[in-house]
């Protein structure tokens, strides 16, 4: 795909709206909506790399309350003709077809490959990738099974959502505590995953979220691993102008 003149591709991840409470999250939602309003002026397309919400579950006739301004702005941008691509994270992994049917936004549960202006991209949320974290990988298989979703749907939404919110608040990574530190390239699972992917296929940019740490690291010849950070502590986003990728703060 060739990017139109004076257009850019934008990337953002890990907003975790709704955490630690809807009231505390609201200013961050307003800031994100303002960012969307700004970038739509020259956006070729927008990639959202997961955990937009701290919890999301789609019952057959019900979706979680709130996030009206965020959803409305996404709908407005999509209706204007600007493509938006959504990758589920570990907090919104139960996303089904609501975004596709109501917002016309495709939803991806796995990494995707793209080429823009001759540059190759590998894009995804990043959870469960690389060595280690075997407990989470096992848990993800259980949570994403059709049986688990069927069981959860039997919980009344008031109970199911409250339970999920309680568990999320207990996770320090999600609550935004300042204990997320760079572990070194040899210990960062997503960095190791990126390097392993490059052994079989070259990408110029391997872009992920999940880690909550803004990072741009060289992982090979003309290859960069990029972590988009988050909208809890850093308010960072990525932009590709057709020639180079930059990580910026809003």
Model regions and ranges:
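Nucleotide donor/acceptor-binding cores
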Residues: 7, 119, 223
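Short, surface-exposed linear patches
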Residues: 31-35, 68-71, 108-110, 130, ...
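Core catalytic region of metal-dependent phosphoesterases/phosphodiesterases
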Residues: 2-8, 12, 17-116, 233
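Conserved beta-sheet core of the metallophosphoesterase superfamily
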Residues: 106-109, 122, 127, 133-139, ...
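Structural motif
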Residues: 116-117, 241
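Active-site-proximal loop/helix segment associated with metal-binding centers of metalloenzymes
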Residues: 126-189
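N-terminal short leaders/motifs
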Residues: 54-77, 176-203
